[in-house]
């Protein structure tokens, strides 16, 4: 039976008609939006879950600027968990579980842990988790013996400035200023370690009022999972690490297997939002929402380096896909993420105009310093490798 052919549009096919504006300054424009049912963003930008686009560095930068990054899944579960932890630890009003080391550890152990975790200092605790000192990179600068004990190099507890476990942020700021220290450990009356506040985080918080954070003051971050065996174990580990959203990452999201995965994730991990995709039709959107999706990613083969349409012959021009899927999701108030086909800022505007709550960007961010892509030199110029994936 012949299938009727209808007109459909992509971003380059349309322009927005200029109209009268009452905005006096770009600073007056509110770009806040919903990533998903329960997650608010201050700008409608999401960095793509691609291995040449988003790992912890990109996710940190995105959240600082009001968006969010989705850590890709093309790495071991342990590595992905560590990337999420890096984002969560990068900025926090209170670091609830600061990195620690034992007094009996060696200088080599301290150096290795600092480098591995990307920190400049470690709190030294005993077997009962009582704070006994602090060791920083400065303590190791001129020490040549890698077998020297941390207990011999650290600043001991008697020389440290600490604060109560329930110290407020304002009190902590005053103590940091008063004692001119960079790190303020939080301890109880018996000396047990309960957290850490740093001057670096205080400064960063003041400089980034638009940053997207969770209820603990940590930066927001999402993480991608697949649908093959082991996805649930990975999802649990990511949520335990602090991931605020899980993205079910497959090329064709309108499938029974994806619907089953969404239902399972919502049942087992109801505390986090599940973003599902990708789809390009109203029917696909409605089915994902019915399965429990808190946001729907729209876009089949529309990415700048995606070959899905070439290989399979399947897809819908992106502007039409976003428009129709947004209409299908309107009644349920589930946000739509336009994923793919965004080649310039004008495309972002068009996607938002037809109903997307946010846009997912890959190629536009792939050449930045924050992306994990490999840097290569061509004819005296720097480039970063970028590739598509499903």
Task: Enumerate the predicted regions with their spans.
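Glycine-rich phosphate-binding active-site loops on the catalytic face of alpha/beta enzymes
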Residues: 64-79, 243-255, 294-312, 342-375
